[in-house]
């Protein structure tokens, strides 16, 4: 299995539903900005708002051959799981990537157990062998990586243009700057609620203590009080 993060913003996704987890799985796709066509004989009230907002198209019926036309990504969670073999056959014929819920034999990809804190995404997979173990590991990670990491990443995001501006011609210099920043005490300060002090430490770490700024002037960290 090759791990990957997909940008689903604005992408068309087909979800063949009706199974017990249909609503929750469709909702997660919508949260990532996908436009979803749901083919399901059942009404899922949890998705009513998305239907009203036009984020979701619902066709109240069971799967029929040809439904995958025009899509590159499909999720299958039908009322009758035996349909997965037929859906997988069409997916192969059309070159569509398929995830069949709880049916790894018919999957082109599987979904990890995920913990999110803002821009931090921790994904755990057992390659389909024991998803329950992945859930337990995710729960342990969730206890360690709390909301402070979301705040920390929000702060680091604001430094991206500063790093590019400071070292516009050297990938290695940018890389070194990022590691200096990450290895600083900034995260500890975020945990203490000292965000402005954390910002000052990151700004100081942007340049090595022995190097001038690229424009020859004093590095910004030298001006921080």
Which residues make up each language-model segment?
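An accessory alpha-helical subdomain
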Residues: 128-225
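Glycine-rich, highly charged phosphate/nucleotide-binding loops
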Residues: 49-69
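Residue-level detector of alpha-helix initiation sites
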Residues: 19-21, 81-82, 128
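E1/E1-like adenylate-forming module used to activate ubiquitin-like modifiers
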Residues: 100-150
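Hydrophobic beta-strand scaffold residues
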Residues: 36, 58, 97-98
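ADP-ribose/adenylate-binding Rossmann-like module
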Residues: 73-79, 84-111
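Hydrophobic, well-ordered beta-alpha structural blocks that scaffold small-molecule cofactor pockets
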Residues: 1-42, 47-50
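Short loop/edge segments at beta-strand edges and connector loops
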Residues: 40, 58-62, 102
């Amino acid at each position: 299995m090759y791990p990957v993060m997909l940008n689903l913003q604005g992408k068309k996704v087909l979800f063949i539903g009706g199974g017990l987890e249909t609503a929750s799985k469709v909702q997660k796709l919508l949260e990532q900005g996908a436009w979803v066509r749901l083919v399901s004989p059942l009404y899922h009230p949890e998705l009513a708002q998305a239907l009203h907002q036009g984020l979701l198209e619902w066709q109240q019926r069971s799967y029929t051959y040809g439904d995958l036309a025009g899509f590159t990504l499909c999720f299958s969670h039908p009322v009758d799981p035996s349909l997965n073999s037929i859906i997988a056959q069409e997916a192969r014929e059309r070159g569509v990537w398929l995830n069949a819920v709880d049916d790894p034999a018919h999957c082109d990809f599987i979904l990890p157990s995920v913990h999110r804190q803002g821009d931090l995404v921790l994904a755990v997979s057992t390659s389909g062998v024991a998803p329950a173990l992945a859930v337990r590991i995710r729960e342990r990670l969730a206890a360690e990586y709390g909301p402070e990491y979301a705040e920390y990443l929000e702060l680091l995001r604001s430094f991206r243009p500063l790093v590019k501006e400071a070292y516009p011609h050297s990938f290695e210099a940018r890389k070194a700057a990022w590691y200096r920043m990450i290895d600083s005490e900034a995260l500890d300060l975020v945990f203490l609620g000292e965000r402005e002090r954390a910002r000052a430490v990151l700004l100081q770490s942007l340049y090595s203590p022995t190097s001038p700024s690229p424009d020859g002037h004093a590095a910004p960290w030298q001006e921080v009080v």
